[in-house]
Amino acid sequence: MKFQLDPKIKELTKKYVAPPNAKDSFIKDIKATFESDRYSLDDDERLLHSHGQHSTDEVYKVLYNRLDSFTDLVFYVETHDEVCLLIELAKKHDVCLIPYGGGTNVTNALKPPRDEKRMVVTVDTRRMNQIEEIDKENLMVTVQSGITGKDLEGALNKEGFTVGHEPDSHEFSTVGGWISTNAAGMKKHRYGNIEDIVQNVTMVTPNGIVNQKQALTRSSIGIKAQNVMFGSEGNLGIITRATLKIHEKPEISSYESIIFK
């Protein structure tokens, strides 16, 4: 079998990004409330935050100028309080917010709707990446929602612990993303899925702050209010904090690989 290494269609180095649908009153309040490094109207930043990793179709559209919708502004939150302030301003000015973690979403949840008439702001949570507490006695860790799996696991390993949650996107995806997509991991048979690991979640919504206790186990008995944040895909609010179960790191780790010739 021979492969064509020289594609007929060349990648476009200069990607087209539609002009932002910026709402002047919202921008004015943003500038008056936050530091200038919290927000960006830059075309490259907007392009980066206007898609996830849904399929090869989405990759093709990014490479060859086929994206048909773009976020209008990217906002980088750093604290829970900043999320609260941003949501209040969005309510005041009727602005649409799209939460963004590691950018690995595969359900088109990061793509701005084509028919959305309001200004769209993508809220990047990756600066909210701190571990607030490692409770070694009760085997729990409390983190901000923007920490990646790689950084969380690395910090816990140094203390002799592990979360044990490893989705394929582990290196880039965030704890908030795990919860909002109801993620499963490669070690789920040992440590469980994300709803088995999470002990508490804090979400900021347009109507206030929700603190959700441990989710219920999986079953088919109708809608369960305790599980409403899991798999919500950013539709209900922005997750800012979570408490997860941790486990002692195994004393021995062994790895095997199979090579096909």
PLM region spans:
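N-terminal flexible segment immediately upstream of the FAD-binding catalytic core
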Residues: 1-88, 106-139
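Alpha-helix C-terminal capping segments
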Residues: 89-92, 232
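Residue-level detector of anion-binding/catalytic polar loops
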Residues: 94-96, 162
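Conserved PLP cofactor-binding pocket of PLP-dependent enzymes
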Residues: 100
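FAD-binding subdomain of flavoenzyme oxidoreductases
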Residues: 129-261
